[in-house]
């Protein structure tokens, strides 16, 4: 990480100097977040990075989450955590899902292992699929927020009772709360934007007149985290178990080496019945799990947490407050995210991951508009992109739930489930999301220059070596949750950064041409370094180059002292780790890869396509 750019400092470099908040209004904020779940905290952590944005986050609960709820962390979410600076801590604490085993009954009705497969294919991500309590993920986000200059912390015990628009004023959304910790006290917050991350029973969604639409599978399931003794051989593997007559069981080993989570199929519900009507107990869950695992034993010593739920797939028709006929014409002011706008079964491990991805998509867009870097139409892309993703998730979850609960006859269903699981492993890893062409994602005319960086999909990292200090690192780890766009300039095979080479020509254009993106941002009064981060990757042996000879754009002066930033130039690594080989980058031509602040590839262009670079950003950056 970088610090000292504004002068020598001591102490923890992750803790930013606190702002003087004496002039800040307690009742008028830029962004109000309702709900402290994964979606709300992802958004709050991202917005806390911007000293010029005021954020207020509230929750109806009395304090931070302690136990239960989601625990599966997809590879893509781990990549996102790296942008916030805590992916390595998750790796250290979490259970790593390395393999998945499948069990089904034999002719005598006893379960037996039918297959054991690798959970995540090689090279899919530099991070593993992990399991860690949602409460710990909350802890990490809360720490990021508290370490920010705002020292941002949630206000708990706040129940939303009213949300309305106040007309054409700066803080046009007014929210009223009951203060549950103080008798007869209410609190009113005026905000430019409100984001409802308040779960499946969202009051923000209700205030917008939106509904979760879909249906229930009328299937009752139980879930429990247990400490138990068993002679079942795969208890420390992720297991999908389908019994002859007692339903299905999904085993997810938990962090810490001893605890396991069990998702237990119970019974079908009547059309007018709900999970709460069955009065399910933890003893009933244990008994059903024992029946499914037979002839293996299960001796539960402690139940850490349990719940019963009904499978359903539901999604909102809109993720913001703009009516269908006004979309693109009217600025959205209120958004919903996470379970507030889509619900599904937990067995594919997508809930927390998709919720966090919702607000990671929204956060940088809000910041860009609030800071004057982009006009408001950028905000409309949140609904366009994430609503489509939610619809896709619902279809996937419906198929997964159907196959997992299907009645067994000749083994064909079990085999189909195994094939489906293997086929969709990339989806469950979170790396199959592809955003459609839009204001911020191109149509891919030059995709052939780097086929391993698919436009509209996440920037698939690869290792490189930093020129200045020979440090190996993953290229995507330079993309932090700071709201900046990235331009990665991949040099052609002859480029050494000398005058006349592609990198030098690109640098000269950016710095000298008054119409370049760099100089247009300066003309508009914007701090270039707050908007774009430009880096270079050369194909030469790093030992044959000197960073001080690189074009000026790639060794810029930065910070209050005007110090040189030596960390923007990289070289390839010989052998199988070569980024040009791993991502199929055209070695002869090189290219420019433009990456969005949420780590998705927006455009790929020839290295000399200066006008196209300008045109891409002119389409949505503020004039």
Task: Enumerate the predicted regions with their spans.
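Extreme N-terminal leader/targeting segments of oxidoreductases
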Residues: 1-31, 46-53, 329
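Core beta-strand elements of the Rossmann-like FAD/NAD(P) dinucleotide-binding domain
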Residues: 27-29, 182-193, 197, 330
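Conserved mid-domain beta->alpha element of the FAD-binding
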Residues: 36-44, 141, 196, 303, ...
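Glycine-rich FAD pyrophosphate-binding loop
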Residues: 48-71
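Active-site-adjacent segment of FAD-dependent monooxygenases/related oxidoreductases
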Residues: 66-146, 394
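Conserved FAD-binding catalytic core of PHBH/FMO-like flavoproteins
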Residues: 143, 147, 193-311
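A conserved beta-strand/loop element that lines the FAD pocket in flavoprotein oxidoreductases
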Residues: 148-160, 298
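A conserved short coil-to-beta-strand element within the FAD-binding core of flavoproteins
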Residues: 156-173
């Amino acid at each position: 990480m970088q610090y000292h750019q504004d002068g020598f400092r001591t102490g923890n470099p992750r803790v930013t100097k606190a702002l003087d908040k004496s002039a800040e209004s307690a009742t008028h904020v830029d962004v109000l977040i309702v709900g402290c779940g994964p979606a709300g905290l992802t958004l709050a952590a991202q917005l806390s990075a911007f000293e010029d944005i005021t954020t207020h986050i509230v929750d109806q609960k009395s304090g931070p989450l302690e136990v239960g709820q989601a625990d599966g962390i997809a590879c893509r979410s781990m990549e996102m955590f790296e942008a916030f600076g805590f992916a390595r801590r998750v790796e250290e604490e979490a259970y790593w899902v390395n393999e998945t085993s499948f069990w089904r009954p034999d002719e005598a009705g006893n379960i037996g292992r039918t297959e054991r497969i690798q959970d995540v294919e090689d090279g899919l991500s530099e991070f593993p699929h992990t399991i860690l309590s949602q409460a710990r993920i909350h802890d990490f986000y809360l720490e990021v927020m508290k370490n920010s200059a705002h020292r941002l912390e949630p206000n708990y015990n706040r129940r939303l009772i009213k949300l309305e628009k106040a007309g054409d004023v700066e803080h046009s959304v007014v929210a009223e709360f009951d203060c549950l910790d103080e008798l007869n006290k209410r609190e009113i917050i005026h905000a430019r934007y409100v984001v409802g991350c308040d779960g499946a029973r969202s009051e923000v969604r209700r205030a917008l007149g939106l509904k979760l639409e879909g249906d229930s599978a009328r299937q009752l399931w139980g879930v429990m985290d247990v400490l138990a003794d068993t002679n079942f051989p795969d208890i420390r593997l992720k297991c999908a178990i389908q019994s002859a007559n007692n339903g299905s069981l999904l085993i997810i080993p938990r962090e810490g080496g001893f605890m396991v989570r069990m998702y237990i199929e119970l019974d079908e519900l009547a059309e007018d019945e709900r999970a709460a009507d069955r009065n399910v107990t933890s003893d009933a869950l244990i008994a059903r799990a024992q029946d499914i695992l037979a002839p293996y034993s299960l001796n539960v010593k402690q139940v850490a947490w349990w719940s019963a739920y009904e499978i359903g797939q539901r999604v909102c028709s809109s993720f913001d407050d703009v009516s269908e006929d006004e979309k693109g014409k009217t600025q959205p002011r209120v958004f919903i995210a996470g379970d507030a706008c889509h619900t599904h079964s937990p067995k594919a491990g997508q809930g927390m991951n998709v919720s966090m991805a919702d607000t990671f998509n929204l956060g940088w867009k809000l910041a860009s508009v609030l800071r004057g870097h982009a006009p408001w139409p950028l905000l409309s892309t949140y609904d366009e992109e994430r609503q489509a993703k939610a619809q896709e998730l619902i279809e996937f979850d419906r198929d997964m739930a159907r196959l997992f609960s299907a009645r067994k006859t000749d083994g064909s269903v079990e085999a189909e489930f195994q094939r489906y699981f293997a086929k969709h492993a990339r989806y469950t890893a979170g790396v199959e999301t592809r955003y459609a062409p839009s204001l911020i994602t191109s149509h891919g005319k030059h995709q052939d220059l780097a086929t391993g960086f698919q436009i509209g999909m996440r920037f698939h990292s690869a290792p490189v070596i930093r020129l200045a200090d020979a440090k190996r690192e993953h290229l995507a780890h330079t993309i932090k949750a700071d709201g900046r766009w990235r331009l990665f300039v991949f040099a052609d095979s002859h480029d050494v950064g000398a005058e006349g080479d592609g990198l030098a020509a690109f640098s000269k254009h950016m710095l000298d041409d008054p119409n370049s993106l760099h100089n247009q941002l300066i003309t508009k009064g914007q701090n270039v370094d707050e908007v774009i981060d430009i880096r270079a990757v050369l194909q030469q042996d790093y030992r044959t180059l000197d960073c001080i000879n690189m074009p000026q754009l790639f060794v810029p002066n930065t910070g209050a002292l005007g110090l040189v930033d030596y960390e923007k130039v990289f070289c390839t690594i010989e052998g199988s780790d070569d980024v040009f080989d791993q991502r199929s980058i055209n070695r002869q031509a090189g290219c420019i890869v433009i990456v969005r602040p949420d780590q998705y590839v927006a455009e790929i262009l020839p290295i000399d396509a200066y006008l196209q670079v300008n045109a891409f950003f002119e389409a949505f950056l503020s004039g």
